[in-house]
């Protein structure tokens, strides 16, 4: 997670960025690292709250230890690792009304445009963004986003992994 943070650390304004949104961030390990560097910020998480019995972990093929989609475990994990309860806002994608405030930073690594097509979120992201909002996510089609955002910058390449992609930072929706 530290290496993930380092791919975008230089783009975070340590004084101005207060409100962070994580879409599909699992337990929130990345946000804990951000919190170590930027304490007392507000973190919002949009997750699904179910554990799939179809996903199997472990070499034997029999162990199912999936926990990253259990929102109670996520909240406990964040608190045990130093995030204050007042900093944590978790939303169940399937049941809750999603947050409608403006965010300074929106992060969705290997989720938005990876598991879920970007188009599913485009209107929602427009609604919760302002001119300075930074949206950071992984994609295999960075050029596609040139027609959606004024600013699109490739900030990291992930070419030596199974999930070959480019991490991009986007801001300022067009139209």
PLM features: what roles do these ranges have?
Residues 61-96:
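S-adenosyl-L-methionine
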Residues 16-26, 44-47:
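Conserved class I S-adenosyl-L-methionine
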Residues 93-106:
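A short acidic, Gly/Pro-enriched loop at the edge of an enzyme's catalytic core
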Residues 132-142:
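Conserved beta-strand signature within the Rossmann-like core of class I S-adenosyl-L-methionine
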Residues 104-117:
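A short SAM/SAH-binding and catalytic strip from SAM-dependent methyltransferases
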Residues 27-40, 56-57:
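Conserved SAM-binding loop of SAM-dependent methyltransferases across substrates and taxa
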Residues 119-132:
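A short glycine-rich, Lys/Arg-flanked "PGG" loop and its adjoining helix->strand segment in the class I
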Residues 1-18, 33:
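Conserved alpha-helix/loop element of class I SAM-dependent methyltransferases that forms part
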């Amino acid at each position: 997670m530290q290496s993930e943070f380092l791919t975008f650390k230089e783009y975070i304004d340590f004084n101005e960025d207060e409100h962070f949104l994580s879409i599909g961030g699992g337990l929130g390990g990345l946000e804990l690292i951000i919190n170590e560097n930027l304490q007392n910020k507000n973190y919002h998480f949009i997750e699904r709250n179910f554990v799939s019995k179809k996903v199997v972990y472990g070499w034997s093929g029999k162990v199912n230890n999936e926990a990253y989609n259990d929102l109670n475990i996520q909240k406990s994990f964040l608190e045990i690792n130093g995030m204050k309860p007042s900093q944590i806002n978790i939303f169940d994608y399937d049941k809750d009304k999603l947050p409608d405030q403006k965010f300074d930073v929106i992060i969705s690594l290997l989720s938005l445009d990876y598991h879920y097509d970007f188009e599913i979120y485009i209107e929602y992201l427009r609604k919760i963004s302002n001119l300075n909002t930074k949206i950071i996510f992984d994609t295999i089609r960075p050029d596609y986003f040139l027609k959606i955002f004024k600013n699109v910058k490739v900030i990291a390449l992930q070419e030596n992994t199974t999930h070959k992609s480019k991490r991009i930072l986007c801001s300022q929706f067009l139209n």
